[in-house]
Amino acid sequence: MPKVIGLTGGIASGKSTVSELLSVFGFKVVDADKAAREAVKKGSKGLAQVREVFGDEAIDENGEMNRRYMGDLVFNHPEKRLELNAIIHPIVRDIMEEEKQEYLKQGYNVIMDIPLLFENELENTVDEVWVVYTSESIQMDRLMQRNNLSLEDAKARVYSQISIDKKSRMADHVIDNLGDKLELKQNLERLLEEEGYIEKPNYGEGD
């Protein structure tokens, strides 16, 4: 019977890379970030609700959500984050549920790629939780390089989530991403072999 696995981790922990690798191994990935973008795409009901609640500044000159403005707003005002989540989350859940059911019907194991799985208390909606683990210092380095953030801003983003150590303790399986991409792939393959998703290579001498 196909399984539904919740994949999560800290910000900049390498979760997207793991998702890509899992899709290569035959899993179907349902991406919460992608669903969230779809929920407020240009012309959508979700975006109309965002404009109604947050005003015209929430929409950019192309008629799309002003992500920089909204990102700063919800990061600095937790009550605004709750208002935005109240609009987006129900739409995102519907999009993800529909996609998940379609894949299950076809017999695929499904990865629910959800950055804030524990923060939104969604662990009971999946069969297992896998956490991509890295150190906080690596998270901050990646954020500073990838998002061009100062150390203080990177720290603020890392500490706005449940710590990666706590998430790891709550997980069914932890995927170590303290090394490079090759090591990450090897760690993931080891887990998939142990759990029976892929066969262990046969290093025997043959017939």
Swiss-Prot record:
The keyword Ribosomal protein does not apply. Residues 4-203 form the DPCK domain. It catalyses: 3'-dephospho-CoA + ATP = ADP + CoA + H(+). SUPFAM superfamilies: P-loop containing nucleoside triphosphate hydrolases. Keywords: ATP-binding, Coenzyme A biosynthesis, Cytoplasm, Kinase, Nucleotide-binding, Transferase. Pathway: Cofactor biosynthesis; coenzyme A biosynthesis; CoA from (R)-pantothenate: step 5/5. It is an enzyme of class 2 (transferase). One of its GO terms (biological process) is coenzyme A biosynthetic process. Coiled coil: none annotated. ATP binds at residues 12-17. Pfam families: CoaE (PF01121). Its main location: cytoplasm. Its EC number is 2.7.1.24. HAMAP family: Dephospho_CoA_kinase. Belongs to the CoaE family. Catalyzes the phosphorylation of the 3'-hydroxyl group of dephosphocoenzyme A to form coenzyme A. This is Dephospho-CoA kinase. It comes from Staphylococcus aureus (strain MRSA252). The gene is coaE.
